[in-house]
């Protein structure tokens, strides 16, 4: 019979039991379930709710179960309803009536809320470490390419010259915001629901401050109804993970473009690419395509959580069992994608020559041509029109701004002199963009200094 079977006269239907069970996915929280139970048993003994002897035996038994699960000596019972019931049943099997005292003044409602917070707190730390590693890998790559000129794009059209370092540092800024969001989520979720009971607390004189402290929380949750029914932290984490995946997907999309024959800006290491079953010439960026695809999956996990919670009255409802598969899936996929993209970035080859050649085409120095006139006193809109007219002239004659004869410039305005060619060279265009956050080597050096400080890099 189930541990909750007192008011029932029949065994639960086998099909219903399988449908109701969550052990298949919540077993991964066994360490956190046992960690929470050890703190709870400690508090029960300290408060005199159970004897110190029983408290010690319960803690001893829980540690034995933890060791046996870690070593593989003990396996999860697939027929158990959930990880909480499995651990309690195993404790009772080993220690008899003493094990039955563990659940005093506790409900599975506050127990599962505790387990999930403990588990996700650890997972956030792991995701944070991976995001940090990815940011570091981007910084290290950027440091090697402060002089590597490439086209900057708007609308996927060549727009203005930048450097590869400048481009990569844009992603570092995204990841820094991701780190901040992870920290904010971890801080907000670091309150302890244990002691909330089923929904209305308990009649026992428990010490919620003690269990919160033992488990590393900042404080107990202030309201018992909220303690068992809150899943904001899951939704907030899924939202943060979705933004991380959006950043990974944008990076992946660019890698997909850059390693195509149409761009050839980079080449993936053979260990991080795949081939075709029929086309022998193919070298496919499957990793980045999968990251792009998995982004949709993580977005779906966020929507699952939002939709699941939107119509639930207070307090706990069985619908909330579905929170775990969604948030576990989101965490697992973000970690998997980060673990894969980091070595891919670290091993890819950058084709500097192709990047510069692409920057030399497409009139990406047209703005600098206009700025040349502005610096000589012409209003920007007039200079803009002249530069656009010169671009049209170049296109009609198959020329570039660098190869257009000086007399053609001077037909437009005598402000053009021989020095225009230096002013519109790619290197000058990049070096001249000295504004804070820009692509000039000086501005990039300052950006590198700032992000390395934030990432605590030497």
Each language-model region and where it sits:
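A helix-coil-helix interface module used to build multimeric assemblies
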Residues: 1-201, 206-212, 274-275, 286, ...
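Glycine-rich cofactor/substrate-binding loops
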Residues: 1-36, 97-98, 279-458
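Generic, well-ordered alpha-helical scaffold segments in large soluble proteins
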Residues: 40, 61, 65-68, 90, ...
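Short, well-ordered beta-strand elements within core beta-sheets of diverse protein domains
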Residues: 40-50, 119, 166, 235-243, ...
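Short runs of predominantly hydrophobic/aromatic residues within well-ordered alpha helices
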Residues: 37, 84, 88, 234-237, ...
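Charged, flexible cofactor/metal-binding loops and thiol motifs
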Residues: 121, 128, 143, 151, ...
